[in-house]
């Protein structure tokens, strides 16, 4: 799987790649990467639970970027903990809700690249390993939500002593109520009352689980949509009493 002809080593960090194209990303624009550009990192978010769909999240020590790939079951070859080099030359970088993404062109915006294109641009390094430092979440407090720079999203985070606003023993994470809504938003509340949106796909394998009540420890990917922070859970198991 992948392309073993891709050269060793990165040419740029993920944070610097996002900075280089910051104006394109923040304008929800699109630009092809036309020079030698390689990033190296570890997958910190895959599609196993169904909450992340046709995307992978890859991290190095500097940050995380979203990769759009028009395939499902990506976790079979690219699970959390898989290290890789990505040859970005020829791919497109752009913004969706001002969140940086690598992919190809879809209706004039950045979209998911075909699976065969992904395989040409990725080289897997070793076996998956859950001990990479990139897989350790940063502690997120209520104060961080106003001080952290949204341009750094996604960020792998952990929160302590938060609770779901609507948890009543019956409310589900993402009940499919018909219609066109493919995701449901719930609020996580910090002890000081600060709220954070948790957005869950109705296709997630935990969508029909009851929202846990009481004080929780929660890990997830802190992302953005425009000027709003939102949390994506990688699995239902990352919400602990």
Describe the role of every protein-language-model region.
Residues 1-53, 57-83, 87-241:
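OB-fold nucleic-acid-binding modules
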């Amino acid at each position: 799987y992948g392309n073993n002809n891709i050269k060793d080593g990165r040419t740029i960090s993920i944070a610097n790649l996002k900075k280089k194209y910051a104006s394109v990303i923040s304008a929800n624009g699109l630009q092809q990467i036309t020079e030698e550009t390689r990033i190296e990192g570890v997958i910190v978010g895959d599609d196993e639970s169904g909450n992340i769909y046709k995307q992978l999240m890859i991290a190095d020590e500097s940050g995380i970027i979203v990769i759009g790939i028009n395939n499902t079951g990506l976790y079979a070859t690219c699970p959390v903990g898989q290290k890789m080099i990505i040859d970005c030359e020829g791919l497109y970088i752009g913004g969706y809700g001002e969140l940086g993404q690598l992919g190809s062109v879809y209706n004039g915006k950045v979209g998911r690249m075909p699976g065969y294109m992904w395989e040409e641009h990725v080289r897997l390094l070793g076996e998956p390993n859950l001990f990479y430092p990139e897989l350790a979440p940063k502690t997120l407090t209520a104060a961080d939500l106003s001080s952290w720079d949204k341009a750094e999203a996604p960020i792998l985070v952990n929160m302590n002593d938060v609770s779901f606003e609507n948890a009543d023993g019956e409310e589900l994470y993402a009940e499919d109520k018909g219609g066109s809504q493919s995701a449901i938003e719930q609020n996580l509340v910090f002890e000081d009352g600060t709220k954070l949106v948790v957005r869950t796909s109705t296709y997630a394998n935990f969508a029909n689980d009851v929202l846990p009540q009481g004080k929780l420890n929660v890990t997830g990917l802190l992302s953005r949509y425009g000027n709003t922070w939102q949390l994506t859970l990688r699995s239902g198991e990352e919400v602990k009493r």
